[in-house]
Amino acid sequence: KICFIFLRILLKMLFGKKAIVEHNRYYFKLCAKHINMNKVRLCDYIFFPGGAQISAFVNFEKPIIYYTDATFHIMIDYYWHGLSSWLITQGEHYEKEAIKNAFINIRSSQWAAASVINDYDGCLQRNYVLEFGANFDDKDLLHATPYKSGALNILFSGVDWIRKGGEVAVKTVQLLNKRGINSCLFIVGLSEIPLKYANLPFVRIMGFLDKNNPEHYRKYVDIVKNSHLLLLPTNAECSAIVFSESSAFGLPIFTYDTGGTGNYVIDGVNGYKLPLAAREQEFADAIEKSLESNEFLQLHKGGITLFNERLNWSTWSKRFRKIMEENNL
């Protein structure tokens, strides 16, 4: 643990506060030293939910399945900005090693899976897409009531105010209210937002909710269940699990067309993806149009269907088993 702390401090000193510290040879070598090879020998294969780069330093002698939501390459200047050339070279090199060493590569979106092929020359025949499921207990999956009239409860969920588009979300709801659509924005994931927005009468700050905490989990389920739509104008996104969770309850989704969102939000089926140039005017227009055309019920049903077909962990496990069988594992 001391070595990891020292490495983090050193890299921050060398490359600045924004430096990512988990994508270089020194970090992966430290991780490799913590592998218990006696336990590895008891396994039939190795499943990496990220972090398969340590395979560059450990000969596992087992088939590796590498599953994650992105590649290093597509995160540069997307999530990560201002990286030094050394950090980029390190990250690219060990991502390529991880993909090459993996017998099977699986990503949570077509966007990420395409990068495995296009940016790292991964094996097309053993490259798959498996979407993330919703992190809800089956017993709690009681569909939300589609919006008909009264106050429109809008859910915003995220811990990064800027990246998730918090300002656009607030201004969208503000505009809806000005148009006579009584709307309330429930903000989950943040305890504080800019003061000029926190005191607006239609904003409800629900705080950060840890789904591993039973009380927080119950509160989160109740919020989602009592919402009518998800508004998430996120300008950078790999595979937000809240998309799957919203579809599980039948909440129409309004977001940006970016990253891996295309596997989770299908225009006209369970919501709409707007171009990145869109602002609150366009989001308000899209929501208002869906309300006026009575499309919410269709989007509600479409979300539930999409969840049942592929955005749940039960289907994920069946598809994963099929992938394993196809590859004789």
Segments from the language model and where they lie:
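Membrane-proximal helix-turn-helix segments that form the acceptor-binding/catalytic region
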Residues: 72, 84-105
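A short, active-site helix/loop in glycosyltransferases that binds the activated sugar's phosphate group
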Residues: 96-126, 134
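Aromatic "clamp/platform" in nucleotide-sugar-dependent glycosyltransferases that forms part
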Residues: 235
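Conserved donor-binding/catalytic core segment of Leloir-type glycosyltransferases
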Residues: 138-164, 169-175, 185-188
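Short hydrophobic beta-strand element within catalytic cores of glycosyltransferases
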Residues: 231, 243, 252-255, 265
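A short, well-ordered alpha-helix in the C-terminal region of glycosyltransferases
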Residues: 295-310
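Nucleotide-activated donor-binding/catalytic signature segment of Leloir-type glycosyltransferases, i.e.
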Residues: 194-229
